[in-house]
Amino acid sequence: MSLPSPWRADFPAFSAFAAEGLTYLDSAATAQKPQAVLDALNGYYLGGAANVHRAQHVPGERATRAFEAARSRVAHWLHAGNPAEVLFTRGTTEAINLVAYGLERHFRPGDELLVSALEHHANLLPWQQLALRRGLVLRVLPLDERGVIDLEQARHIIGERTRLLAISQLSNVLGTWQPVVELIQLARERGAWTLVDGAQGSVHGRHDLPGLGCDFYAFSGHKLYGPDGIGVLWGRPQALEQLAHWQFGGEMVRHTGFHEASFHAAPLGFEAGTPAVSAAIGLGATIDWLATLDEAEVAAHEGALHARLLAGLLARDGVSLLGEPQAALASFCVDGVHVADLAHLLGEQGIAVRAGHHCAMPLLQRLEVPGALRVSLGLYNDADDLERFFLALDRSLELLR
């Protein structure tokens, strides 16, 4: 079965890749962009760029309408109740830092912050550093042998001192879906805030906020086939009201003198300075493009490709998967082979994958591996991409063994 992607033609980058002999299998790091997004970016600049929320002229009003329309599209896509619940950020990393700084005043020494053992540095370091600043306790939820947060152990760890739970929806290293709904329920029973890192999960169909029940949800545009430099923090209205302002400057201020100021509520109060106007408009176009797709068809295509990827890896001697991948990607090691050497040889054959710790050093330390090679899929990949990857992998292993 050839498993062609019916959406590949929407992505101009693949024409360029074909001309260069490249096979792109690194979508968990960043995704390629469909023509609809490129058209939106180009159209904004060709029509005249302007700042938003601060001009009475036609270009400014036009830019503001497009910017806020993008916010509304994101809110609708997330099934959020109100566009005002959507804050634009530079990405998932900034969104999580915003929450960490915004909630800091509410914590007292000895309060507990909970993350899991698989977190990306973006959902670890903000809480680690907050704990160090405020004398808090950072606790780590362990994983089971599959690479899934152990719910039974979590029930014993989430307790009276738990004030915040921050977890990833889909591991960027293990490719495992996490039991976020159950964990959120446990945390809410203790009155703790909950944040979900949706950088990977949002890309693969799980972006229904009412179904999650979290207080905050963060994701990045560039992994979702959208522009770089734009991300989203969604917040429950009651949770957003608890955030202190953390960046200060133009347009987030309601009134200021030399010695005091008052600030806007969300979202504008958390979007200081000139926002990424074009990127936000491009993200709106991304959401529009995604809305034209049949999610079940996309899921079936990605699932079939992922199954073929796993089968091919497991069929090769010496290959060990990290965890039990369920979606989108697979990370692996090869006995007696350094992943950097393997990635180099694959790159020389035009195969774009990633090697290293994948911004999850503590996870790889717990797994007792110095690094791993990751293959990650997008909806534009097809079986031919995997065939080229496996051919290059076999050639590389012949040289390295």
From Swiss-Prot:
Record EC number: 2.8.1.7
In-chain residues carrying the UniProt-annotated modification N6-(pyridoxal phosphate)lysine: K223
GO molecular function: cysteine desulfurase activity; pyridoxal phosphate binding
Reaction equations catalysed: (sulfur carrier)-H + L-cysteine = (sulfur carrier)-SH + L-alanine
GO biological process: cysteine metabolic process
Cofactor dependency: pyridoxal 5'-phosphate
Function: Catalyzes the removal of elemental sulfur and selenium atoms from L-cysteine, L-cystine, L-selenocysteine, and L-selenocystine to produce L-alanine.
Cited PANTHER family: CYSTEINE DESULFURASE, CYSTEINE DESULFURASE 1, CHLOROPLASTIC
Protein name: Probable cysteine desulfurase
Species, as recorded: Pseudomonas aeruginosa (strain ATCC 15692 / DSM 22644 / CIP 104116 / JCM 14847 / LMG 12228 / 1C / PRS 101 / PAO1)
Record gene name: csd
